Amino acid sequence: MTAILEKTEVQSLWARFAAWIVSTENRLYIGWFGVLMIPCLLTATSVFIIAFVAAPPVDIDGIREPVSGSLLYGNNIISGAVVPTSNAIGLHFYPIWEAATVDEWLYNGGPYQLVVCHFFIGICCYMGREWELSYRLGMRPWIAVAYSAPVAAATAVFIIYPIGQGSFSDGMPLGISGTFNFMIVFQAEHNILMHPFHMLGVAGVFGGSLFSAMHGSLVTSSLIRETTEAVSTNAGYRFGQEEETYNILAAHGYFGRLIFQYASFNNSRSLHFFLAIWPVVGIWFTALGLSTMAFNLNGLNFNQSIVDSQGRVVNTWADIINRANLGMEVMHERNAHNFPLDLASVEAPSING
């Protein structure tokens, strides 16, 4: 009798670590993108919470008039925010070691840049992690492609827009009222509501919500019953079953009769592709619009009113929007400049006589 002895190969610590990182058997997949994502998102989240609760006021406009954003300095959940980095810093990289003291770093809004940069790296890695897990499982990569839409939108407001405007102080504040303030100022300075790409984004978000609600309600209403009337329909479902759980033809027939035949899908793949692509493309366009307006390539500006043959102004909706934009711009950074930039850009009259 011959005994066959096999030499057991001892794996190195690194090999075992690498196998654990890319294992799809873990409860939560880590992946190589996760190695960078986890510390970045933990850092961003921790600093955001601390700054939201306790950060001192920030000199956002760079004019020695600090703005309070934290809860301990008089704000509530609605008005609180992590205030953007000071205009005095501009686009300079501003880690803690660039400031003379921690107090100076806080005064100039260093936490905002720290949170935004780590958050940006984190969400990009999350998108890469989605692709990585799909690749390991032999799936197609479209989950990561869909997630690229919100990543593009976040990149536009936190990275591209400050770069285009020349300062991180123009980035979106990290808070509820700060977000609304950013939107109002953006409208005042760029007339975003009159930009076709923003209109496509609105159609994508609201249309996606409508289509999602329609699809969910149709599926829920056409479940295949495997039980009696006395028992819940859900009791007939087995997790992971191969059989269809709802009748797409019944849903197609219902919706076709409700509107018209070709308004509904009878192909499940086409239906779900449409549900995915509609909001994603809309948000892509919005991010593209934000990124172009960052460099002052603005929306459709109707700066000249329509006049009749007698020179009288024919009031239009564009006049109302223009007036609202000027009013919002007057109130924005009211201590930093006295007039809206649209009015202040006109050459001053000579005073030399």
Swiss-Prot record:
Binding site for chlorophyll a ChlzD1: H118
Site (Stabilizes free radical intermediate): H190
Chain positions of site Tyrosine radical intermediate: Y161
Enzyme class: oxidoreductase
Additional remark text: 2 of the reaction center chlorophylls (ChlD1 and ChlD2) are entirely coordinated by water. Herbicides such as atrazine, BNT, diuron or ioxynil bind in the Q(B) binding site and block subsequent electron transfer.
Lineage of source species: Eukaryota, Viridiplantae, Chlorophyta, core chlorophytes, Chlorophyceae
Its EC number(s): 1.10.3.9
Annotated keywords: Acetylation, Calcium, Chlorophyll, Chloroplast, Chromophore, Electron transport, Herbicide resistance, Iron, Magnesium, Manganese, Membrane, Metal-binding, Oxidoreductase, Phosphoprotein, Photosynthesis, Photosystem II, Plastid, Thylakoid, Transmembrane, Transmembrane helix, Transport
GO molecular function per UniProt: chlorophyll binding; electron transporter, transferring electrons within the cyclic electron transport pathway of photosynthesis activity; iron ion binding; oxidoreductase activity, acting on diphenols and related substances as donors, oxygen as acceptor; oxygen evolving activity
GO terms, biological process: photosynthetic electron transport in photosystem II; response to herbicide
Cofactor binding mode and count: The D1/D2 heterodimer binds P680, chlorophylls that are the primary electron donor of PSII, and subsequent electron acceptors. It shares a non-heme iron and each subunit binds pheophytin, quinone, additional chlorophylls, carotenoids and lipids. D1 provides most of the ligands for the Mn4-Ca-O5 cluster of the oxygen-evolving complex (OEC). There is also a Cl(-1) ion associated with D1 and D2, which is required for oxygen evolution. The PSII complex binds additional chlorophylls, carotenoids and specific lipids.
UniProt keyword annotation of Repressor present: no
Protein name, UniProt field: Photosystem II protein D1
Domain of life: Eukaryota
Subunit comment: PSII is composed of 1 copy each of membrane proteins PsbA, PsbB, PsbC, PsbD, PsbE, PsbF, PsbH, PsbI, PsbJ, PsbK, PsbL, PsbM, PsbT, PsbX, PsbY, PsbZ, Psb30/Ycf12, at least 3 peripheral proteins of the oxygen-evolving complex and a large number of cofactors. It forms dimeric complexes.
Residues the record lists as binding pheophytin a: Y126
The record's account of how the chain is modified after translation: Tyr-161 forms a radical intermediate that is referred to as redox-active TyrZ, YZ or Y-Z. C-terminally processed by CTPA; processing is essential to allow assembly of the oxygen-evolving complex and thus photosynthetic growth.
UniProt-annotated binding residues for [CaMn4O5] cluster: D170, E189, H332, E333, D342, A344
Record-annotated site: Cleavage: A344, S345
Main location class: plastid
Gene transcribed to yield this protein: psbA
Membrane topology annotation: Multi-pass membrane protein
